[in-house]
């Protein structure tokens, strides 16, 4: 267990934002389904990206790692090279690859760690039942064994659990011999993630018609082509630095595509609504020290931003209400419960509701001991508000940032952050 003690300091300077995990997962999978070699550059080898690489190797894909790059020799005819696909704690890896594995008609078992073991997969179980695909699971939890062949046709999928199920099907269905349609039976949340998927499919030569978000039309017998791509910066990660810059002395965030399809790009507009001074320039965003005010924030399309927005709201003038956040309960932790618990430990006033948070802002927080709940976004959100603490902030389980942002603490230091690190036990 790693601990980090942060001495309250206002950060300033420039930081290069790590590449988007969401975009990289999709590029990796599309490249793996082509019949040629694709080169992917600007890759950050977070635990989740490593999980997808290892899982694809289990399906016969050849992947060579370079210095922040990947060379992928695709295999348009995937096969079960290893019958066990371990997804570590990556929900994207698991949910994206299950449908692809189901196109093979061979027995394969998916395993995982931590909260991933419990994250819901009912959307796929319903499909398996309707198509008579054999599956075995432990009361709905991992490990999951499947044996059968996915068929083209009409699919009915809930849109309010996770858009990852839609993405998983969109990767697999173009490979089948017949045409398919995915009908979304509830409001589709996190639409932007599906936009990223369809955009990436298009770059690799695969066409999907889904402009209405109510149904997606997928032609069968499509072929993925090899493509070289550079991974853009991650807006879910820039959120932490924008908040720290607003609470500090100003930060310039580099390596961003300000025309990105990433839904978390809305962080810029949310922060402006709260009073943050932000300027978007070509490939970068500058944030200046700002006084912030509470607002109502609908996070149905940007759930990953909730922890850091809650942290900022806790030191903003007035009251902030974060609504439509029920899905936060089935992430790496119950994020509504986790961020409420930890912010309140250090003097915040956060009220947890079933699907929302009400936050009454304070001038400062007191600091003290908090835990990450083994959740990377909780750890980074707490660090983001450390400059408003009157005493050092000690975060237990700080190593969890490796899941998405291995260089987070190094970047924190580079901007003037004062931290001490130590480990206890293994």
Swiss-Prot record:
Pfam families: EPSP_synthase
Keywords: Amino-acid biosynthesis, Aromatic amino acid biosynthesis, Cytoplasm, Transferase
Gene behind this protein: aroA
Homology family: Belongs to the EPSP synthase family.
Catalyzed reaction equations: 3-phosphoshikimate + phosphoenolpyruvate = 5-O-(1-carboxyvinyl)-3-phosphoshikimate + phosphate
Domain of life: Bacteria
Recorded coiled-coil stretches: none
Pathway of action: Metabolic intermediate biosynthesis; chorismate biosynthesis; chorismate from D-erythrose 4-phosphate and phosphoenolpyruvate: step 6/7
UniProt protein name: 3-phosphoshikimate 1-carboxyvinyltransferase
BP-aspect Gene Ontology terms: amino acid biosynthetic process; aromatic amino acid family biosynthetic process; chorismate biosynthetic process
MF GO annotations: 3-phosphoshikimate 1-carboxyvinyltransferase activity
Annotated GO CC locations: cytoplasm
Entry binding sites for 3-phosphoshikimate: 21-22, 26, 162-164, 190, 304, 331
Catalytic residue positions: 304 (proton acceptor)
Oligomer status and interactors: Monomer.
